[in-house]
């Protein structure tokens, strides 16, 4: 059998040659050769190694680094169920075009179907949820196989970036001679693959009542479209993680405005990113009487209503004339009225609410800050916050919009962006990824502040059909799911500083200083009146 140490060295050398600079490792026995080579590469400053004991969290940490940095990031595990624990992060990476590189250690192929310990058929475990997968058995093939996987991960030729899987068969002995760890890695080269040309640009004609709908997108993309919409006087309906939600064109109450008369007059929608948050937007994107232009650099695109008229790499908005400026002013006037109503409602609502927490958190952050927002209610609460001239970089896992792995993702975003991160999460989201509060004493701690909106359960369900009075009897047990967990004790178990607040003033004080290390701010809110608040917000102005 090939030498396991040489194989591991070939894999790490090829990852480095292909531009990988961050690797997340979950320890194990079969992956020992990879772990030791990665440790040496980290020691020598060749890469940055992050060690976590929970594979699910490790996968989301790698996802966060890749999401914020735009570079491929590897996550390394041992064999067996360890690999399967990466599946949620792989799914999110697939649907959000994130270059996540799974490197799984495996037993030699001859041991499959023999009952050997921690041995299963894991080469194609992720099936259709990775862009490419291969098995590596020989160090001589490492640069070729890893190079092609990295091309698939970055979408350089396919224009479809996403996760890939390298399964590495490692035979005993698994621990190399210590002298090998001091030797330089082999010099390898991966094939240079230039990015596929992007050249389809559509120039949009004037005279059509146009809006831009911006969904989840990287900061550079969102900020570009915020500037374009402002220059063209086009109303901008931007979700928080679109990174377009700032400037004069963005409308903070757009999902409420879509329930009024303005929506009926829309003649064209330009879609950027991946919109997922609201039913009013979905209804708009499903209309057959509206010209729907989808702009994407990828080979897949957002079209949930199956109504797209054209999909292009880029679009040019027309120069604004009197008609365009009048159209924009109608939206701005409606926005001002809706904003005043929403703010008055929240200011007068008894007790602290999720939307109030969201607008307070946003107000505390500047354009150089980073915000990770959780799924469920937090991102929707942020979607009602006022729009300012600038905004922080906002990240979210909107590929599949799960609530798992978000603490780990926030930590990854901090490493990938190089900025302190504030994360706005629900209590159940924190509990889903509580293992991420456990960071070993040998691992550096990034500056991540977790603002946990604790309403003791799943309050988003109160705003949906099952939150109606007809379902009151089963609601708490099967939807509300109160847990009664002491978040202070949970944080203390991981050595994480904790602060509990119950008022807006206390929250503002807690947010006044930038994050230092990993810390938790628990914000206590009442879930009992969440449905009433949602109905009041959606009521006609």
Regions found by a protein language model. Name each.
Residues 1-3, 283-377, 486, 495, ...:
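Phosphate/pyrophosphate-binding active-site segments
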Residues 1-18, 143-205, 320-333:
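Cofactor-/ligand-binding subdomain signature composed of acidic, glycine-rich
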Residues 3-88, 385:
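N-terminal cofactor/phosphate-binding cores enriched in small/glycine residues
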Residues 8-12, 29-35, 332-418:
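Active-site diphosphate/adenylate-binding microenvironment
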Residues 19-22, 67-77, 83-88, 92-104, ...:
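Structural signature of the thiamine diphosphate
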Residues 63, 67, 78-79, 214-307, ...:
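Glycine-rich, anion-gripping cofactor-binding loops and their flanking helix/strand elements
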Residues 92-93, 103, 110-123, 381, ...:
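Thiamine diphosphate
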Residues 93, 104-149, 238-339, 440:
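Glycine-rich, acidic loop regions that bind phosphate or pyrophosphate groups
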């Amino acid at each position: 059998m090939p030498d396991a140490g040489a194989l591991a060295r070939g894999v790490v050398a090829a990852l480095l040659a292909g531009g990988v600079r961050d690797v997340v490792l979950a320890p194990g026995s079969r992956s020992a050769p990879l772990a030791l080579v990665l440790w040496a590469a980290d020691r020598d400053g060749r890469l940055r190694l992050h060690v976590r004991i929970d594979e699910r969290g490790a996968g989301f940490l790698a996802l966060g680094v890749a999401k914020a940095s735009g570079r491929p990031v590897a996550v390394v595990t041992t064999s067996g169920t360890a690999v399967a624990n990466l599946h949620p992060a792989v799914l999110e990476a697939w649907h959000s075009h994130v270059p996540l590189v799974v490197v799984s250690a495996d037993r030699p192929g001859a041991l499959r179907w023999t009952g050997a310990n921690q041995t299963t058929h894991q080469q194609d475990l992720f099936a259709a949820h990775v862009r490419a997968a291969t098995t590596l058995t020989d160090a001589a093939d490492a640069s070729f196989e890893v190079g092609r996987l990295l091309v698939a991960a970055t979408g350089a030729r396919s224009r479809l970036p996403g996760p890939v899987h390298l399964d590495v068969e490692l035979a005993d002995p698994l621990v190399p001679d210590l002298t090998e760890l001091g030797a330089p890695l082999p010099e390898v080269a991966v094939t240079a693959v230039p990015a596929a040309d992007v050249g389809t640009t559509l120039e949009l004609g004037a005279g059509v009542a146009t809006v831009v709908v911006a969904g989840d997108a990287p900061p550079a993309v969102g900020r570009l479209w915020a500037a374009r919409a402002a220059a063209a006087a086009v109303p901008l309906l931007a979700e928080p993680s679109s990174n377009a939600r700032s400037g004069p064109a963005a409308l903070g109450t757009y999902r409420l405005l879509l329930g009024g008369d303005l929506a009926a007059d829309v003649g064209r929608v330009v879609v950027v990113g991946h919109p997922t948050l609201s039913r009013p937007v979905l209804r708009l994107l499903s209309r057959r009487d509206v010209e729907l232009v989808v702009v994407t650099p990828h080979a897949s695109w957002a079209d949930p209503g199956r109504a797209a008229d054209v999909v292009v790499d880029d679009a040019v908005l027309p120069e604004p004339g009197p008609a365009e400026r009048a159209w924009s002013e109608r939206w701005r006037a409606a926005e001002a009225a809706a904003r005043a109503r929403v703010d008055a409602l929240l200011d007068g609502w008894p007790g602290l609410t999720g939307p109030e927490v969201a607008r307070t958190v946003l107000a505390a952050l500047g354009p150089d800050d980073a915000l990770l927002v959780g799924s469920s209610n937090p991102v929707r609460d942020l979607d009602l916050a006022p729009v300012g001239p600038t905004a922080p970089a906002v990240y979210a896992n909107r590929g599949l919009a799960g609530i798992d792995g978000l603490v780990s993702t926030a930590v990854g975003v901090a490493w990938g962006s190089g900025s302190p991160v504030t994360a706005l999460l629900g209590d159940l989201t924190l509990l889903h990824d509580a293992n991420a509060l456990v960071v070993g004493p040998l691992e550096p701690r990034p500056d991540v502040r977790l603002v946990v909106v604790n309403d003791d359960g799943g309050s988003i369900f109160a705003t949906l059909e099952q939150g109606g009075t007809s379902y009151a009897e089963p609601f708490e047990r099967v939807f509300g799911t109160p847990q009664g967990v002491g978040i202070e004790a949970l944080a203390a178990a991981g050595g994480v500083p904790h602060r509990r607040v119950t008022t807006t003033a206390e929250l503002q004080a807690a947010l006044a200083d930038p994050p230092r290390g990993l810390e938790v701010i628990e914000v206590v809110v009442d879930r009992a009146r969440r449905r009433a608040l949602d109905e009041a917000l959606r009521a006609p102005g």
